[in-house]
Design a protein with these regions (language model features):
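Positively charged n-region of N-terminal signal peptides that target proteins for export
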Residues: 1-5
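Hydrophobic h-region of N-terminal signal peptides that target proteins for export
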Residues: 7-19
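Short sequence/structural segments immediately N-terminal
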Residues: 19-488
Length: 488
């Protein structure tokens, strides 16, 4: 929607006192906003109190400055019964925020965050819409129904496609929604209030790790839990009063040194970098898909401008953040460890797993998740594999190992391999094309199990490898018995 912000036409200059430069505010509160306040302070006092303690209030930016609409906007409606009848809209979209926060809004809408609503059609959404749910929620925009599991689950983080049902009113299946990739009636993607919650829009709140934890948690992307166990999370909670979270510029190494938060590493300013609202510009691996890929590859698929930024540049951007507190050698060595874990996951599990699932297709029922092995494979990469990768990125050892590579290996060898073997046996027994497909799968499975990464399963370690393992066990026993020092 294109908002008629009354004071926008008298702005003369943009000011840059803050890294997130905004345009000059109005000199006084508008009459329209005053009227909004007079009613809503009685009907919705929490809204007015929050706004009254915000920087928006101090800058004379009020209800009407954000919610004003043109009559032709898809979600505009005449707010009647008032002294001054004006068109407003319920949703304040990134396009509206861009009237003042142009740089931040542009960066955000060109980021992966803003594309989160494009989940429709993915395996995740198939689960919520069909397998977990049903079409029992019927609304004006969804007369045939939509899944409550998708509406109250996926869409609340990823964002809904907001539907207008007439006279500016929004379909209840799609609103309320503050999903980061919400698709708004004006065509914009994203929701600034996903991080800058209404109606205080606090930078300090957005800088807190819990702010990101609404969505970045759980079995498939437990960044919040990983942060809590990491040295960074421990330092944050121990020294929160030293974080200076309200600082306008909030430069790590200058305004604070106690700990980093999610925002520190992925968005906030350093002595050498400006704030960015494109959260992909410091990430050197995309660990969302079954096989980890470089971020410019996924950016290209989404048509993002950042596809031109190579992973090496993004890594240098992140290293600049790290080196506000850590030495260059420390940071370089961390990335050696991180890359090694990603390589382990990709080469030992992800690539062989994808190949085996492709070869197994002729032996599977066509409907996704109608086969036991569909669930096993999905959780291998989508849950355990992601946990290990994300934890390595954030230095969370328990989630890297016990919740990550341990669960990954346990289910690979105790579920995935036996389920492949079961498919092979059933295919052989069926004869014909199934038997031929089973023979091909047997070859692929044998190739995987006889590879250096997996041959232990067949008891095919070399004599040298067995000798090395025995020596390690013997040494451990000696250490436990106090016969040798652990540093010997």
């Amino acid at each position: 929607m294109t908002k008629k912000i009354l004071w926008i036409f008298v702005l003369a200059v943009a000011w840059t006192a803050s890294p997130a430069a905004v345009k000059s505010p109005p000199k006084e509160m508008s009459e329209e906003t005053k009227e909004c306040v007079n009613c809503h302070k009685k009907d919705n006092p929490g809204i007015i109190q929050q706004w009254g303690s915000s920087k928006h209030y101090g800058a004379n930016v009020g209800c009407y400055e954000c919610h004003a609409a043109d009559p032709g906007d898809p979600d505009a409606y005449l707010h009647d019964g008032k002294k001054v009848k004006k068109h407003i809209s319920i949703i304040v979209s990134p396009k509206d925020c861009a009237n003042c926060h142009e740089k931040a809004a542009t960066e955000m809408t060109e980021s992966h965050h803003a594309k989160g609503g494009r989940i429709i059609g993915s395996l995740d959404n198939l689960l919520a819409e069909v397998i977990e749910g049903n079409n029992s929620l019927k609304t004006p925009a969804f007369p045939d129904g939509v899944s409550p599991a998708a509406v109250s689950g996926c869409w609340q983080c990823h964002g809904s496609l907001v539907k207008v049902i007439g006279d500016g009113q929004l379909d209840p299946a799609t609103w309320p929604n503050t999903g980061i990739g919400r698709i708004n009636p004006d065509g914009s993607e994203g929701s600034c209030s996903a991080c800058h919650s209404r109606h205080k829009f606090s930078s300090a709140q957005a800088r807190n790790p819990e702010n990101c934890g609404k969505c970045h948690l759980g079995p498939d992307h437990p960044q919040m839990e990983i942060y809590e166990e990491s040295k960074h999370g421990i330092a944050f909670h121990a020294n929160k009063d030293e974080m200076n979270l309200d600082s306008p510029k909030w430069i790590v190494g200058e305004d604070y040194t106690a700990a980093p938060t999610c925002a520190t590493c992925h968005m906030s300013a350093t002595k050498n970098q400006d704030i960015t609202h494109d959260i992909g510009n410091r990430i050197s691996w995309n660990n969302r898909p079954p096989v980890s890929i470089r971020p410019e590859v996924s950016d290209q698929k989404y048509g993002l401008k950042s596809a031109s930024i190579k992973w090496e540049e993004r890594r240098d951007n992140m290293k600049d953040v790290c080196q506000a507190c850590h030495s260059e050698n420390w940071v370089d060595n961390f990335y050696i460890q991180y890359d090694a874990l990603i390589n382990l996951y990709n080469e030992k599990y992800a690539k062989p797993g994808l190949k085996l699932m492709e070869v197994a297709k002729p032996l599977l029922k066509p409907s996704k998740f109608s086969n036991k092995i569909d669930w096993t494979w999905f959780e291998l990469w989508h849950h355990e594999g992601r946990r290990a990768r994300h934890a390595a990125a954030m230095m969370g050892p328990d989630y890297t190992h016990w919740h990550g590579t341990y669960d990954l290996a346990k289910h690979w060898y105790s579920k995935f391999v036996p389920e492949l073997e079961e498919l092979i046996e059933k295919g052989k027994a069926a004869g014909g094309d199934k038997a031929s497909a089973a023979a091909k799968l047997q070859v692929a499975l044998d190739d995987m199990l006889n590879s250096d990464d997996h041959k232990w399963y067949l008891d095919k370690l070399t004599d040298a490898q067995k000798k090395m393992r025995k020596a390690a066990v013997d040494r451990f026993k000696e250490q436990m018995d106090g016969k040798v020092g652990s540093s010997r």
